[in-house]
């Protein structure tokens, strides 16, 4: 089979900002023994951690629970694609990253807000099942370094969560402990009255977690003095193919969804690989050196791109 590619490192970011909201209090998640409300930070300590909870591996999550979470996330991925595909140009998004970021809000939501988030993100599990399941999937993709398997050479995957709160807002300790324990998200204090400094602090965090590939995630004007909470999720992925492409890049024709021909730089190789087909499409599977990771590429039949999109 003859394959061509123009792939580059994948970087996905989910960012959520919230205006004033009710302080979290949950009967489902109790404070850790010995956990006490964090002391108000001083102005010069605006990046101080506000929960001592460490990111922990969950107790065994049943396979059926993980399967239900994965199925819902797949449905959400298609829902989101249909919503954003109308914009021109190429797009890259990480449904799991978005689900993880919004789940950190969902943990503190109740009533109608909780219901609407669950409907939009296809969360069908109860909260006390959902968060441990998300934690299990996240740790499977990006295990903590102590005792973790050594990644294959040429493989990099980093998943990081952060939460930034208004310095004088009364966030509840059980909520902060949940974010630290389940999502590894330590809250940092910011004073959003100084929107520029807050923006720079968060952007520096994102830049650090994406090896400098994204330096200006939050544009001027997004944060205001009314902002109370910012949640950020960053994913950085770069890996070598199991079977490398030949170093022979050349100009080749490519056909975007609009059917027009453009010329792009491509590499190619002939190889045995996973292949499948169905009504109106063909698909191939490309393996990375790290056996956990594979890329599936789907090619709709010529002239049927929009019809194929509608079928998703």
Language-model features: locations:
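Detector for small/aliphatic-rich hydrophobic stretches
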Residues: 2-12, 16-192
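Mature, solvent-exposed C-terminal subdomains and processed small-chain segments of exported/organellar
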Residues: 301-312
